[in-house]
């Protein structure tokens, strides 16, 4: 069971979408709301447990190299996800059109956004010259960011937290699953 202050209905929906597409994820058994629960734990997801060990903890258990089958299986899953198209409008948001969760933005919640311009404006707005060695470096970075924001990108479904600790590999070297879909959604 997952029951944290970050657990959401959107995460359960993301997992169900991935499972329906053949991507190995824990199977959602049920999802529930707990509006009066302590510590802001308002949602829980009851799910199956996947076998394997995370890539982050695999150094002693697996020989990680390009010969392992998990790497090709990982590529297939990612390519498959990249083929999905957003339903209806090209909203940047969760699978159900609500806000996205990301540990990479202040407050950890953002959107949904009606277009890419709105999305990029939100991402760049907290930028501050204080984080750079000089004002010139800050200005140069803003110009570069603005150029990137002018490009039009396809809206694709993305896991949102694709790190080694969220990828499981079995003892046989095969991909056994992806965890933590709380940041998943439609992104440029």
List where the protein language model places each region.
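ATP-binding pocket architecture of kinase catalytic cores
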Residues: 1-109, 113
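Acidic, glycine-rich loop-and-strand cores that form catalytic or ligand-binding grooves
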Residues: 90-147
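Short, solvent-exposed segments of well-ordered alpha helices
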Residues: 65-68, 149, 153
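Short amphipathic alpha-helical surface micro-motifs
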Residues: 26-28, 64, 137-141, 159-161
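Active-site Asp-x-Gly
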Residues: 116-117, 152-157, 163, 168-188
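Intrinsically disordered, low-complexity regulatory regions enriched in Ser/Pro/Gly/Thr
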Residues: 22, 38-39, 149-151, 161, ...
């Amino acid at each position: 069971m997952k029951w944290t202050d970050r657990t959401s209905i959107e995460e359960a929906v993301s997992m169900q979408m991935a499972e329906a597409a053949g991507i190995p994820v824990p199977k959602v058994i049920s999802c529930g709301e707990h509006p009066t629960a302590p510590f802001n734990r308002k949602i829980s997801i009851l799910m199956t447990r996947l076998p394997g060990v995370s890539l982050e903890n695999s150094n002693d258990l697996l020989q990680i190299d390009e010969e392992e089958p998990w790497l090709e299986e990982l590529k297939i899953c990612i390519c498959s996800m990249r083929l999905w198209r957003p339903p209806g409008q090209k909203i940047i948001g969760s699978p159900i059109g609500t806000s996205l969760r990301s540990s990479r933005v202040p407050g950890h919640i953002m959107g949904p956004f009606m277009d890419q311009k709105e999305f990029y404006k939100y991402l760049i707005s907290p930028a501050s010259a204080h984080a750079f060695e000089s004002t010139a470096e800050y200005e140069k970075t803003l110009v570069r960011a603005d150029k990137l924001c002018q490009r039009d990108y396809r809206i694709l479904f993305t896991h949102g937290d694709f790190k080694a600790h969220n990828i499981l590999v079995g003892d046989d070297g095969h991909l056994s699953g992806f965890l933590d879909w709380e940041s998943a959604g439609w992104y440029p």
